[in-house]
Amino acid sequence: MITMNINGKMIECQEGQSVLEAARSAGIYIPTICYLSGCSPTVACKMCMVEMDGKRIYSCNTKAKNNATILTNTPTLMDERKSIMQTYDVNHPLECGVCDKSGECELQDMTHLTGVEHQPYAVADDFKALDSWAKALYDPNLCIMCERCVTTCKDNVGENNLKATKADLHAPDKFKDSMSKDAFSVWSRKQKGIISFVGSVPCYDCGECIAVCPVGALSYKDFAYTANAWELKKIHSTCSHCSAGCLISYDVRHFDTLGEESKIFRVLNDFYHNPICGAGRFAFDVSSSPKGSANLKEAQNALKECEAVRIGGDITNEEAFLIERLRKELDFKIYNQEAYRFQQFLKVLGEVKRPNIEEIKTSNLVVTIGSSIKTENPLVRYAINNALKLNKASLIAMHPIKDNVLANLCRSSFCITHEVGAEEILLGMLLKMLNIESAALKSLEDSKQSVVDEAALKALEEERKKALEQAEQGCSIGENKAENQEEDKTEATTPKENQEENKTEVKEEKIEVPTKTTYLLLEEAGINLETYEKILALLQKSNNTLLVVGEEIYSHKQAHNIAKMLRLLAQKSAVKLILIPPSANALGIASICELSEEIFEHEKIVGIRAKGDFTINSDNRVFGKDAVSKVDFILPSLNQLEGTITNIEGRVLPLKPALRFEGYDLSDIVQGFGFVEENLIECTHKLPTEAGFKAIEFDCLTNYFTNDRVNHRGYLLGTSHFENSAKECETIECEPIKPLKEKIAFNAYLKYPETQFNNATNKSENLQLKAGVYVSKAFLKKLNKEVGQNITLFKEEEELTGVLYLDESLDQEVFVISPSLLTNHSNFFREGVFDSVDLKEQA
């Protein structure tokens, strides 16, 4: 830690921290327009200027210095900032009355803050054409060229789709003498450029550029001219689509003239701390019919008569708690196959330290295994990109399908395409590289073999050739001496003889062929020697490595052994582990419920937020339209209730209702069995402490970040019962890694596209990416089909039909199939997420 004096206040800050971040952490305000926390500074607005030890600096890109004296608000600095705001206001359209940003516009705020009362500058205005991409509308007439959108697209999202490009606008130099240097710099930047979409592929469902725009230049298409910022009520909640559990804010306002019907107009995020994906931002249009269901007795009877309850991966902790208590009362089984596998995995792995998302950003090396990061957890992908861009980290992404999104993040992205089922072998490779001894490595060691080191052999041959040439050159010199020094033949011939001897020795010297060690097991898995050496070099170079384990690991045939190997890795090395839960609240469900493996038998099953013979779920009503899902009993959607979910970091986070729901919820159903809780949140402080939950009431849960980037959202789980079960497993050694018996041929992969996660996102009309069958551009051409056509695939006489879409990031000839297209007992993907299917030709 170092100390600085800011405006007479002594503060402590981290070495290497910027002056701006240090000031913000200490609660000292320095104005900015272009700066985004956790991103590279652009110094576009110059508003963050301060004086450090008597010299003017820009606080966003200047590192804190020990014992420095800093002033942030001298009269000179305030005059400079006022001049800058005057240049920003030149020709800015006076449409605040109808601008979507009015009331929360940073240009308005800064104009008032700096006291701009008149405009001394004038210049001819220019025509600037409107533009749009994805869900964004771009009005360059409102743009102040702060380049926040460019920065977040590059440093957070990782797409590099936006760029500041040159524009032929009026930018006379006549103000150079009358404007201050910084103000003229800002003026020139604004008058000589616009933002352009430069991506090589289309952008879908993101909107982070809209979120960070400080003015009305970038707006959400469906929000334009529908509501004013000051009319909207902000409800802070948690996104429930994936396990990231991002902080979101619903902007809600009455929709009818009587004020009885409310509507979510948009979703915002705290972009300084938590970028969000398109699902969190746009899939807010789906909820349950507000009246709910009246057939309470029918739902209770269905639970009495059922043999099992199948639960969805997004049920709340409180719903899981009630279902588990009901299981003990009625003796039924609880099914959720994904959460069950995750639970079994955790019982062996135990309680390894859970890094938070911020720790990904500070890593030197990130390794991913068994995960399609871009679809499973977008926030993890954003953090990886941030580490690559700002921390100069490297990425090793190992998966049977190459992800060009990850590969194109930067030059230090290394994507490895391996054989299906090789994850256990790859983890053994990592243990070997980290010098961790384990019985698991026996089969790997047994497959060791030596091969010729071609590079070293070539170098030796070059060296030998060079030595021969030098010897021959020396011999020639000796002969010349003999001819020129006839008076002393003995002395002249002696060197020649020696040289001949040396020459003979060089010729007869045998080269020992250099070898390298390879492993047949790795070769069979798709890891050749060159790849092995590159991974080894990156691991040895890194002093802060993080391993991301994806959901495909939990369904691996060797998941039990992989869990033991990962526990060993966590105990014996400094490598950090992040496990991506397979659904939004899989960690909460696995911690609370006693799950059973679902065997495909004829049972009476009640589905709670899942399909069943009797289905208790949201009916997925798009606002203003009829419900699209047929259910037997309507539950409130997760944007209509109070409760909690547990995210990837093990953080218990609050859900808040944005829309009204007048019907019954699960707490009303279970009251018929003698339960006393009148609503779900009466269970929040009763969640099992042996699973790591704390006796904290729902209304005491906080949900915000502070300026020093500290997370004050909910609370972190404590040590859970998983650790006790893992310690029991420790007495059993790891099994030797199993070789791949044969390569698994596949042409189908079970995975949602980006921004699709569950029924709610599937039914959303706001999202551009839909559930369906996705293929690469080359494969689409080979199939001789067009986007939007229906395609039918079959396996063992069962057919699957979906709409055909293009995945621009895909190269391989594979059908990427959305899970929502499958039935519960489908023949497709019975052995895992990779399968071989046939195409049904249309008549």
Features from the language model and the residues they span:
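Structural alpha-beta junctions
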Residues: R327-Y335, L388-S394, R411-S413, S438, ...
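A generic structural signal for residues embedded in beta-strands
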Residues: V50-D53, L547, L793
